[in-house]
């Protein structure tokens, strides 16, 4: 695979990370949160192709069957929770919304946004493609896209107010639904 093809694959895989990062950035955008989400999304996007490559093509059917459902469930849960919490915090302005850049929410988001990368790893294994360099490109690209998306989400939130938090949660729900339909 050429460098251009590798970069295009990395950009395509980073789109989910970008969308989720923008949704999270509407509420959570201090430097530590940006680092945590960008680092973990990049790390998971890098490690999932490696895991997929090692597991091999025998389980490719399983991932292609259940991967979208797993991602759907994780994104629906976290997006719904974000939207619900933002409605609650709009009603009680002192309400605290849980930080999705920490703990189990961070791991679930990282897994959900990197399931496609697992499938790419299977493909690389089947085709005998160079894995390490491609995985590094994929991880770096996802991390950078997440960083930019969180900054953009935060800027939109400052311009349009607290309702952008609800939009952020609904973006995650929309991505979850898209995974099942397309």
From Swiss-Prot:
Name of encoding gene: mntP
Source domain of life: Bacteria
Mode of membrane association: Multi-pass membrane protein
Transmembrane annotation, as ranges: 6-26, 37-57, 59-79, 104-126, 131-149, 164-181
Primary location group: membrane
Single GO term (MF): manganese ion transmembrane transporter activity
Family, per entry: Belongs to the MntP (TC 9.B.29) family.
Function: Probably functions as a manganese efflux pump.
Localization in the cell: Cell inner membrane
GO CC, one annotated term: plasma membrane
PANTHER family per the UniProt record, alphabetical: MANGANESE EFFLUX PUMP MNTP-RELATED (PTHR35529:SF1)
Entry protein name: Putative manganese efflux pump MntP
UniProt keyword annotations, A-Z: Cell inner membrane, Cell membrane, Ion transport, Manganese, Membrane, Transmembrane, Transmembrane helix, Transport
Organism lineage string: Bacteria, Pseudomonadati, Thermodesulfobacteriota, Syntrophobacteria, Syntrophobacterales
